[in-house]
Amino acid sequence: MRRHRAYLTGLDAVLGDGDHGDNMAIGFRAVSEVIEDLPPDATPGVVIRAAGHRLVAAVGGASGPLYGTAFIAAGHVAGDARMVGVETLASMLDSAATALARRGRCAVGDKTILDALRPAADAFAAAATKGSPLQGCVAVAVTAARDGMLGTRPLIARRGLALRMGTRSIGHLDPGAVSCYLL
């Protein structure tokens, strides 16, 4: 996220309050620190939940609670398993998208993070159902996230600070959808 800090901040300066890049960089630096403090044998669920709690605590604005909630939900699905398979990863992504939508009271088409996350989760799950290997599931999820992110450009924002802009939000990518794609 540090590499994309200026880009995300520039996007958010148009639609929001111009802090999304800073918040994401701060948040994921804090996530790195909390992960370093975990025991080496921490399960994926523990790591992901810890990351989510740190995002909620460290990141201002809406993105910290939204991303944090998504990570925490995904971590709960992972549970205490030492390894997670493709099917569990699909459930984790679905749970993350559902929790984020509930927390943000948003839907696909509202010009939010969810416009990238939900299509990615659905594409990953569809590929997993067809028996695709992890790499194939990730590839279709990344493509779906990219398409969802790019699809925010013609939308009118219906959530967040960009809501104030009304039709002036058309023609701009949603910073949250962009950061979701980058993740």
Model-assigned labels for residue ranges:
Residues 1-183:
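N-terminal loops that bind phosphate or other acidic moieties
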